């Protein structure tokens, strides 16, 4: 039995200058999902986002990349959730996670923002913490004062390869989540190990 996911959200900052920065890992994941399923995203002025739709069998999934900056991501999510009457527990948000190393991604249900401004704004705008999360590891600079520069910087070639490979697996795990459910998707993604290349 699959898990209902009605809204897939990728977090990032809009604009070419941010495209390859670590903070845009959520965008990368949604782009990968859309590429695999031949989904086209189009601008929507009301929700200030790029939006798309994927229908297969019983699944009817809306996809959103907010085009406000990260700390205003909640506007787009709340606007679309309200319009399509999607409850928080049927929303899946993909975003970059400092507390996981590159090459690791984890599903999570509910909880606080963990210092992530995009998640913080979604909680504030939707009034709920109950949405599912897909946390994509980007690593940590080791010093709290360096976090802003780190997330807005580009990963090294090796880190980027680890992140990209992991995103491919995480994107496929969303298919597993909808087809086979939370437990199977968790098992698949959480047992993934990146290939280390010398």
UniProtKB/Swiss-Prot annotation:
Domain of life of the source: Bacteria
Catalytic activity entry: an N-acyl-L-alpha-aminoacyl-tRNA + H2O = an N-acyl-L-amino acid + a tRNA + H(+)
Enzyme class: hydrolase
Any one GO molecular function term: peptidyl-tRNA hydrolase activity
BP GO annotations: protein quality control for misfolded or incompletely synthesized proteins; rescue of stalled ribosome
Site (Stabilizes the basic form of H active site to accept a proton): 96
Record-annotated active site: 23
InterPro entries: Pept_tRNA_hydro, Pept_tRNA_hydro_CS, Pept_tRNA_hydro_sf
Cell compartment(s), UniProt: Cytoplasm
Homology family: Belongs to the PTH family.
Protein name, UniProt field: Peptidyl-tRNA hydrolase
Species of origin: Idiomarina loihiensis (strain ATCC BAA-735 / DSM 15497 / L2-TR)
Originating gene: pth
């Amino acid at each position: 039995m699959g898990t209902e996911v009605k809204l897939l959200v990728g977090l990032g900052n809009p604009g070419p200058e941010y495209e390859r920065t670590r903070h845009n890992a959520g965008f990368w994941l949604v782009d990968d999902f859309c590429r695999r399923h031949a989904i086209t995203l189009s601008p929507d002025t009301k929700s200030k986002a790029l939006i798309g739709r994927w229908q297969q069998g019983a699944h009817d999934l809306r996809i959103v990349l907010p085009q406000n900056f990260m700390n205003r991501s909640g506007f787009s999510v709340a606007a679309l959730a309200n319009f399509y009457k999607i409850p928080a527990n049927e929303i899946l948000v993909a975003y970059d996670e400092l507390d996981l190393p590159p090459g690791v991604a984890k599903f999570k249900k509910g909880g606080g923002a963990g210092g992530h401004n995009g998640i913080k704004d979604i909680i504030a705008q939707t009034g709920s913490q109950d949405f599912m999360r897909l946390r994509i590891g980007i690593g940590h600079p080791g010093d709290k004062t360096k976090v802003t520069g780190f997330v807005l910087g580009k990963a090294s070639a090796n880190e980027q390869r680890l992140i990209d490979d992991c995103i491919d697996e995480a994107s496929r795990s969303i298919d597993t989540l909808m087809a086979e459910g939370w437990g199977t998707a968790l098992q698949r993604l959480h047992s993934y190990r990146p290939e280390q290349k010398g």
